[in-house]
From Swiss-Prot:
Protein's UniProt name: Poly(U)-specific endoribonuclease
Main localisation: nucleus
Enzyme Commission number(s): 4.6.1.-
Organism domain of life: Eukaryota
Reactions listed under catalytic activity: uridylyl-uridylyl-ribonucleotide-RNA = a 3'-end uridylyl-2',3'-cyclophospho-uridine-RNA + a 5'-end dephospho-ribonucleoside-RNA
Oligomer status and interactors: Monomer.
Pfam families from the UniProt entry: XendoU
Function: Poly(U)-specific endoribonuclease involved in the processing of intron-encoded box C/D snoRNAs, such as U16 and U86. Releases products that have 2',3'-cyclic phosphate termini at the 3'-end.
Originating species: Xenopus tropicalis (Western clawed frog)
Any one annotated GO CC term: nucleus
Keywords: Endonuclease, Hydrolase, Lyase, Manganese, Metal-binding, Nuclease, Nucleus, RNA-binding
Gene: endou
Length: 293
């Protein structure tokens, strides 16, 4: 079935995503704005297991220039959203007027960036977005922040933003989502995330400290994520732009677009939950099992 088959390289999206990469002025620079310590290679963990050998004695993030991070408007407004969600699916979310205002402030901030302007222009050309910025903002709000139910018979308990950027749990036993480096860093700092090691690519014995797409293994509040994937250092608007473009240019339930961005050949995977984003993440193509994400 087309929706689950790996496609050939999408040259059009590769070109667009490299434009977005080059336009990402808010991206944090490896070795200067942050430092990571990859340490050991993670071991195999069967799906559903919460036991993992720890191949990393220290946190992944050795240093992040938080002053610089929080001085950049899109990062600052993004960070303010991270504590607005209930971790467990099956527990109805309650969205306050203050949280709605924070969501809108974040969208206003990213819509001012070159990255989102390029993505918006592309989607307008593809007839997938209206030219009006306000219309596009409303479209983004629906796609990313509209609540829906992941657990049958339950009230609205999730949204695309929560799953992808914040992370959530399934019955307190399984980590779902959490594909964002800022949330990973902040949870590491609170000692709720324990980095277990990197998951290597077949064509590269180990990642480099300046790699900006990584496959990781970690535990979060006693649950283990056997493989989690994340961009490192990129701005929130960069990820929003990538995933929104893939979501709006495909009607499939599961879309895997193969792209080359900088040195990284990867799939951008986006799962559709009706009119909303279910999940979205990058997969380095040499990873053995993309379905563990």
């Amino acid at each position: 079935m087309e929706s689950n088959r790996t496609r050939g390289l999408n040259h059009e999206l590769s070109k667009l995503f490299n434009e977005l990469w080059d336009a990402d002025e808010n991206r944090m620079k490896a070795g200067k704005d942050y430092r990571i310590s990859l340490q050991g290679k993670a071991g195999y963990v069967p799906a559903g297991s919460n036991q993992a050998r720890d191949s990393a004695s220290y946190p992944l993030f050795q240093f992040v220039d938080e002053e610089k991070l929080r001085s950049r408007k899109t990062f600052a407004t993004f960070i303010s959203l991270l504590d607005n969600y209930e971790m467990d699916t099956g527990v109805a979310e309650v969205v306050t007027p203050e949280e709605i205002a924070e969501n809108n402030t974040f969208l206003d901030a990213i819509l001012e960036t070159k990255v989102m302007k390029i993505a918006h222009d592309y989607l307008v050309r593809k007839n997938q977005a209206k030219p009006s910025r306000n219309d596009f903002k409303a479209q983004l709000y629906t796609i990313w922040f509209q609540l829906y139910s992941r657990a049958p018979g339950q009230g609205p308990d999730s949204c695309g933003f929560e799953h992808v950027f914040v992370g959530e749990s399934k019955r307190g036993k399984e980590i779902m989502g959490l594909h964002n480096w800022v949330q990973f860093y902040l949870q590491e700092k609170r000692k709720t995330i324990d980095y277990k090691g990197y998951v290597g690519r077949q064509n590269k014995s180990r990642p480099d400290h300046d790699d900006q797409v990584l496959n990781l293994q970690f535990s979060w509040k006693e649950m283990v994520k056997p493989i989690g994937s994340s961009f490192i250092g990129v701005s929130p608007e960069f990820e929003f732009a990538l995933y929104t473009v893939v979501f709006l240019t495909s009607q499939e339930k599961m879309t895997r677009e193969v792209v080359r961005v900088e040195e990284y050949e990867m799939q951008i995977v986006v799962n559709r939950h009706g009119r909303y984003i279910g999940t979205a993440y990058p997969v380095l193509l040499s990873t053995n099992n993309p379905d563990l994400y």
